[in-house]
Structure formats: C-alpha cells, structure tokens
Amino acid sequence: MPKRTDINTILIIGAGPIIIGQACEFDYSGAQAVKALREEGYKVILVNSNPATIMTDPDMADVTYIEPIQWQTLEKIIEKERPDAILPTMGGQTALNCALALSKNGVLKKYGVELIGATEDAIDKAEDRGRFKDAMTKIGLNTPKSFICHSFEEAWQAQEQVGFPTLIRPSFTMGGSGGGIAYNRDEFQAICERGFEASPTHELLIEQSVLGWKEYEMEVVRDKADNCIIVCSIENFDPMGVHTGDSITVAPAQTLTDKEYQIMRNASLAVLREIGVDTGGSNVQFAINPANGEMIVIEMNPRVSRSSALASKATGFPIAKVAAKLAVGYTLNELRNDITGGLIPTSFEPTIDYVVTKVPRFAFEKFPQADDRLTTQMKSVGEVMAMGRTFQESLQKALRGLEIGICGFNLRSESPETIRRELANPGPNRILYVADAFGAGFSLEEVHHYSKIDPWFLIQIQDLVQEEMALEKRAFTELDYAELRRLKRKGFSDKRIAQLIKVSESDVRAKRYALNLHPVYKRVDTCAGEFKADTAYLYSTYEDECEAKPTTRQKVMILGGGPNRIGQGIEFDYCCVHAALALREAGFETIMVNCNPETVSTDFDTSDRLYFEPLTLEDVLEIIYKEQPWGVIVHYGGQTPLKLAHALEQNGVNIIGTSADSIDAAEDRARFQKILTDLGLKQPNNRTARNAEEAVKLAEEVGYPLVVRPSYVLGGRAMQIVYNVDELNNYMQEAVSVSNDSPILLDHFLKNAIEVDVDCICDSEQVLIGGIMQHVEQAGIHSGDSACSLPAYSLTNEVQGEIRRQTSAMAFALGVKGLMNVQFAVQNETIYVLEVNPRASRTVPFVSKATGNPLAKIAALVMAGKSLAEQNATTEIIPPYFSVKEAVFPFIKFPGVDTTLSPEMRSTGEVMGTGQSFAEAYYKAQLGAGERIPSTGKVFLSIADEDKPQIIRVAQYLQAEGYGLCATIGTAQYLRENGVGVQIINKVREGRPNIVDSIKNNEIAMIINTVNNLPESIKEAQEIRRNALKLHIPTYTTLAAAEAISEAVRHINKYDVNALQQLHLSSALANQITR
C-alpha cells in the first residue's frame, strides 16, 4: 500500500526539555521521523521547546517552532500553519498528553487536523489505567489485581483489597512520576497525595504488589495490514519494584524458555491489536512469577519510548523511522532495511548474535537530601549501553563506560549488614553490592534470597568475582596469551587486570601488544550475519574474525560524551553530531565513538563509521590502532574525552584543534593567572590550597565570602559559596573525596555581579564572537542553572565591546583553534574573568539557535584546517529579537530536596523562549520549563534585608498587573514605608496561620523568597520552597529572577509564536549576512 496522498503537511510534537524519565532518546526518534517524512515529500512542521536538540536545527524540518509544548501554544501554531495531521508518538508522554489536550479542547476538530501514528482512542486506552485493564481482561491476559481511584476515600478502599506492600501508579505520567511503593499507611497517604497531583486526570491505579517477579519488555512494530514484528525482547536484571529506566536491562532476554518467549510474543501482538495501535512502534511490559511461571501484563506505551531507542541501537533497526513511514500508510514489507543496504524488507524480525547490556547512571551526589532507594518512580539521569558476545563481556564494558570511577566490579569491604540491606532495598549501586556479597563469601542462594535477582545473572557475576579473586594471587609473568585472551573475552579491562595484579595499566597494554592480542570488531547487522551489512556499526570483542574493514580515506574520529549526567548532557552530543555532519560534508570519513544509546550521535547514519564502545583510554586506543585516523576531536564531548587528551597525545595520537597543553593552560590556575596578568585582565582575588590548614590561612587573604571548588570539574561538582571559616572547614572535609588530588580553588565571591557567558571560535588568525549571553541570576549561581538572554538585556555597549576585546585576547593567548567559552562577572562596570574553557560548552546549541550561526559546524571545519575567512564566518550576528534559555530541574522527583540554586549545577535540561522583548522571551521560557504562571492571585514576598531596596519596583509591577501582595513583617513594613500596600503574614516560627498554611490552602499564587545566611532563615525558606514545589507554585529565589518575572507577567496569554527560519532570516537581514 503506497503512502497517503490526502495529507501534505504533518506537525510533529517534540518532547521538550530533558527531564528524568524523558531524555534525549526523543531527539533521536524525532530527528529520524522528521527525516523520514521529508524523504517522502511531506511538509514537516516541528514544535519543540528544547534548543539543544538536533531535531530543532533549522535545516531539519520545513518549519521549526522552538515554543512551549502546551495545547494553547500549539493552537496558535496550528492556526498559522494549518497542518493536515499531527504525529504525536515521537515526543514521549509530553507529546501524547498535548495531543489529547488539543483534542479535548476542540482544537483538532476546529481546524480539521487528524492524529496519525496513534489515534486518540488508542492513546487513551493505553494510558488510562482502567480502560487498559478492561482491554487486557477482554483478550484473556492477566493484570495485577488493581483498582482505579479518583479520591483518597477510593484509594484507601482499594488498599484494603490489595494489602501491603501497595503499588501506586498515576495515569498519564512519564518515568513513573508521582508513583511509588508503600509499605505502611503513612507512605501510602504521602505517595497518593503526590500521585493525584502528578496525574493530569487526577487518577491513580492502586495495585497489588508483584515485587520480586521477573520483568520483561517487548518492542513491537505493527502496520495497517496487521503485519507485526518483535524488534527486540528486553529482560530487566532487577526484578519488579525498580522502574525499568533505573534497572539494568539486557537484550535479548536471557532467562526465558522458547515456549515462554512465544507466549509473550503472541501476547504482545494481541495487546497492540486490542489497544488499536495499527501503525508504529509500541513497548509492552510483562512480569513473570518465578515461582510458578504466571505471566501478567504491566503496561504498554503506544509510542516510541526510552526502550525503543535502546532496542533500535541494540539491533540496528530504526524503529522511529519505520514508525513514521507506517503512520503515513506504508506497510512493513514495502520498506527496506537500511543496515543491509535494502537487501531485506523491514518485515524481517531482527536477529542478534550478541548480548546488549544497559546500565543507568544516577546523580544522587547532586541531591544529598534525596532518598536514593530505587522504586517505581524513575530517578536515573542517563545510561550507558555496551555490546559483547556474552553477558559478562557486555556488563563489564558497560560498567567501565559509566564513568563513576570503576573499571569493573572493584570489590569493597562492606559489612554483611550493609550488603544485606543494599541487596534487599536497591539503591544506585546494587550490582556492586552483589559482587561485594560474593567477595564476602555469601552463597548464591543468600544473594538470590535478598535481591530476588534471577540466579542465572548471579552465577555470571559470581564467576567474575571468582576470576578477580584468583587474579589477585597471580604473578604478572604468569599471564600468557591464552590466559589474557580468556580474561578479555569475559570483559576484563587492562586497567582492572592491572589493579588486581598490581602493575600499571600501560604494563598490561604493552604485554598485550607484545603478544599481538587485540580485539576484533563485529558489525551490528540486524540479521546475525545472514546478509551482508552495508553500514559500519561496530562493537569490540575478542574473537578471530574482524569485520571492521577500515578504509584508506582521510579520517577524523570524534569522541562523544558517554552517558548523560547533570553537567554533561545533550548539548555536547549536539556538538558531536554537528562535527560529524560538517566533516563528512568536507570530504573526511567520520568515525564516532560513544556508548550512549539515547543520542543522535549513536544513530548509525550520523557518521560514516560508528563504534559503540566505552570512552576509556584502552577502548579508544584500540579503535585508533584499527582505523589509523588523521585526527581526533576531544573538545566536543564535554569532560569525558578531554580527560583522555594528554594520554592520547602521549600515545602519538594527533589531536586536532586546540592542543592538550592549551586546555591545561586554561585549567591550571597558576598558568592561567600568568596569561591574564600578561594581558592586563582582572580576576576575582584568588588562591590555591592543597590542604585544609592552607585553605583557612589563604581564605583570610582572599576575604569572605568565597567560592570554593576543586580543580578540573564540570557542572560545578562540589562547588560552594562559604561565608566563614566554619563553613570552609566543613567543605574541606566533604570535598576532598572529589578533588582527585587536585588543589582546592578559593575565589573571592563577587556579590551583586552580573554573570556573562561568551561563546567564540578562533582559527589562530581571527575570532568570531558567537554570542554574548547575560545571565538572569547573579554570579554565584552555576551558569548551567541560570536563565540567560541573548542579546544581553541590560549591559552597556561599552561593557559588551570590552568583553569582545578580552575574549579575543584570551583566545589568541591560549592558542585556541576551535570553540572557546568564557565566563565573566561584571560588577559596577568592572569586568572580571571567572573562567575560560577552550572547548565546546553547553550553550553552543542555544547560541546557534538564537543567532542562526552553526557554531559547532564552523568550529569543526576550523579544527580541520578551514579558516573562518574561507567559511565567510567572521561576522558576529546580533539578532533583532531576544532569546532566553531557562534551566529545567528534577526537584519534583526528589521530595525533600531544597530547590534553592547554588554554584553546583543541578538542572537536567533547558528550554528556549523567543520574543520581541526580553520580558516576552523570558515569559515563554518559563512556560516552556513547565511553570504554571498565574494571571491573578496573591504573591508572597519574603526578602533578605540587603535585597529590600530592589524589591520595591518588583512589588509595584506586580501590583500594577492586578496581583495581591502579602509578606513577612520585615518585608511588609519596608514596602509600606515605600508606598506599597501589602498584607502581613506570619513566618513559620511566628505562630499560626503562617505562610506554609497559606501555601497548603492554595491561597498563594507565586513566591519570591530571597534568604540571608542565618540558619533559622535558611531552614524556614527550605520549608516554604518544599511545600511550594509540591503544589507547583512558581518560586523565585533570586532578586534578578523576581525582576524578570515581574516584567514577564505582562505577556500572559499575549505572546506570538515565531518560526525559527523566519527569525534567522530577520537576523541575517539585520546583520546583512549573505552567507
């Protein structure tokens, strides 16, 4: 059946900002869908609020809107663009919920728009817990005993029926948001409160516990002719009770019998048919009782998902691309398999002859107050995937790819009590405790009893632990070719072997090279070698035949960023993708190395050759040994590849672009200070301390308050502002573990300074200023957590001119060749240099979208030898409109965590708003970030004494827009003295009713709360913010943010939507750019 010709224009809804439960896998799927539909001649309109995505590049879709993903904004776009259809299955839960809201509010009917890929009824049937349960009963599939509830009374009645422990699952949420497992009445009440709030339909499923059952997933694709295929089966290493996004998962399923697999396969197809998913991909989750084999259906997602991105990367089958084409009428047998060069149709089920393991990455170090126990609400921020011929090999490769300081199991001496507790109550490191248990002499039965992990997996880990313990007793000289090869086949890294045998990693590598023992590379081909693979999608293993077949072309290798984490996320992958595309266009063969299954960089057609490998020195050197690239780029993947720069250079690798020595000159405090002194540039007063005693002494010289941090970190890891010697001593005790024997840096903290970010490109002869961004939050808030505006909204032209001059001077002095980011602080018109990073920064995608200048692409060509002049890229573009980037935080996933901002980065993603004024752009950025900004109601003000003079104007603006004001007594008296009418409200410690009572009673619409450094003020402010977070009340904790929102509220419901291509055209005309 050919594609549909009755529709011409299709709108795709993206997933919005990166949040826990919905990450960059939707950029991967959305980008595939856009390309697939344009390939078929459809006009594609894309809506997404996330500027760090490849899918929002102006040359991806025909028309691109970087706008808030809410139905009111979508209606404005639909009215303007008049699409024939909407594809809502590529943007996760956000897109599905938005599509349903468009339908519910009559927008689809009003403009005659149809949903393709999944009908409204199919979405509702899959997402509505009650309807889904009824559908499963109808087709004879069991589900856990459960009840749909819309009130606390119903919830308690249901709980009595199912007993404890009780699972609570809200409807229409992602990543298990709002859900959890309750073991007692207090926990049940708390989780239900959270769940009702999280569910847009105020609906919960109260479900019997199936904790300890084995969990499986099936990735299914179906077309309109009822052809169905299973792309991949996935088994969760962790049993039921841990969200699948937080579980280690393995593909294909390892412990199913063939009979069980066929039953599950047939059930999956029956689920899709009953729900009504007739074009596209879905994910169906099952649980099996290990005691008797009983199988139940847990849930299904009628869209591409996190698991489908994993299945696509695991098999090479492009689920999103195929699903997009099925949505416009094709059938599976009409589409061809790209990996095999079109030799076979996509109706052939993929077959894999290797094992894929995904391990999640967590960020609890950023949220010390958070509960780190894993439940049905997802908490991981990223993941790593590895392939090997066995589970053992792929697991060990995945563990070293996590970049958490381990290169294998790294056994620890934990107490038996700790081990039992960690096995029974899973946390982020449970797999390491499994190994610790075997190392401590626990039996297989004991470990299974406490963890409920399938014995087959435990046997594999027990064997690896026994290998480690035996290796510790061996002499290095005893390791011959056969023994070393046997260990490598089980996934042991050179570094881990070296640690166990007490030699250096380079000793092991030298011995391996002397024995001519190298990995071979196998191709991911979807067909287990039955047909020739046309694409070079490769993984390493220790076997005989190598399928890499390297070419003799001039090659550039790009090292990716590894797993997402706070401080290093999709922005760096964006840069890697642009480097690959630009260099390929310039005639180079591009080689991508990465291990993150969520990303566009690990799509098999982004680069010429893809190596899905951990980003360790050993793994990278082996690929270089095989491929012999002309140059390697380490500047685009964040701190991960940068840490390898010196070692790669020492091994004779040609690092193109800025040299490792220049990177070190920017990071090394003494060297960098000398450069600034020579240039006559200012830095905040600072010193470097190597121990606690020295820090205390030097702090007196610098003067409090201080910004303290370890050297060589990304994302402000362990960065803090300290106000006195006691706080400094506390910091020194806690921060030593993250300092890597590097010194602690002490900088004088510049109060009330404006922070400024600059991205630029230097080619040794000229400097292109990419953009000057003014932060909304003052210096002292991590740049990744602050909102910022391009162009600057209050800096004078003189200050901006001087910033440009200083940026250029530093780029030349450091010998930068490629991208560079500088952070300045401006205090009373005086400019201070905070730090310089001669690499890609997390603001590069935002600057590129805001200006239309593709910085990552231009810089990649500079690194390969093409000057800025040759690219006609020497003119800074200053747009005639404002773009605001706003950070998005995961606080809702971590009840109890304080939401105040600090020098340590805690945001997971970002959004962008555009407007003719800063206020309009800021308002749209707040909407995009999910803030529910009220148009009326009462604003609560509690302001630190030093901030009170500036709050008067904020209060006046808010009052002029019709808001009521209430404040604590000190703030209220100050405002009244300055002519602002305000109601007085009690602080928490001043009696009842107080501000927290008012918050809980829904009497407060917005909160502006700045805090002094007194312990009682900090504690009270935390309670205010914690309660506000529960009820989604917008809260602003800095004066600058308060000023911005007081201006932004004028634009409530009065904003325009702007196509990115039109914005860039207006920018080019304003700047007379002809390129």
Swiss-Prot record:
Pfam families noted in UniProt: CPSase_L_D2, CPSase_L_D3, MGS
Q: Which GO terms describe its biological process?
A: 'de novo' UMP biosynthetic process; glutamine metabolic process; L-arginine biosynthetic process
**How, per the record, is the cofactor bound?**
Binds 4 Mg(2+) or Mn(2+) ions per subunit.
- Where does the record place the region Carboxyphosphate synthetic domain? 1-403
Q: Which cofactor does it need?
A: Mg(2+); Mn(2+)
Q: Where does Mg(2+) 1 bind?
A: 285, 299
Record-annotated residues binding ATP 2?
709, 748, 750, 755, 780-783, 823, 835
Give the binding site residues for Mg(2+) 4: 835, 837
In this chain, Mn(2+) 4 is annotated as bound at 835, 837
Q: Name one GO molecular function term.
A: metal ion binding
Residues that coordinate or bind Mg(2+) 3 = 823, 835
* Superkingdom of source: Bacteria
Keywords of this entry: Amino-acid biosynthesis, Arginine biosynthesis, ATP-binding, Ligase, Magnesium, Manganese, Metal-binding, Nucleotide-binding, Pyrimidine biosynthesis, Repeat
Q: Does the keyword Aminoacyl-tRNA synthetase apply?
A: no
Q: Where is the ATP-grasp domain?
A: 133-328, 673-864
Where is region (Allosteric domain) located?
931-1075
What does this gene product do? Large subunit of the glutamine-dependent carbamoyl phosphate synthetase (CPSase). CPSase catalyzes the formation of carbamoyl phosphate from the ammonia moiety of glutamine, carbonate, and phosphate donated by ATP, constituting the first step of 2 biosynthetic pathways, one leading to arginine and/or urea and the other to pyrimidine nucleotides.
Q: What is known of its domains?
A: The large subunit is composed of 2 ATP-grasp domains that are involved in binding the 2 ATP molecules needed for carbamoyl phosphate synthesis. The N-terminal ATP-grasp domain (referred to as the carboxyphosphate synthetic component) catalyzes the ATP-dependent phosphorylation of hydrogencarbonate to carboxyphosphate and the subsequent nucleophilic attack by ammonia to form a carbamate intermediate.
- Report the protein name in the record: Carbamoyl phosphate synthase large chain
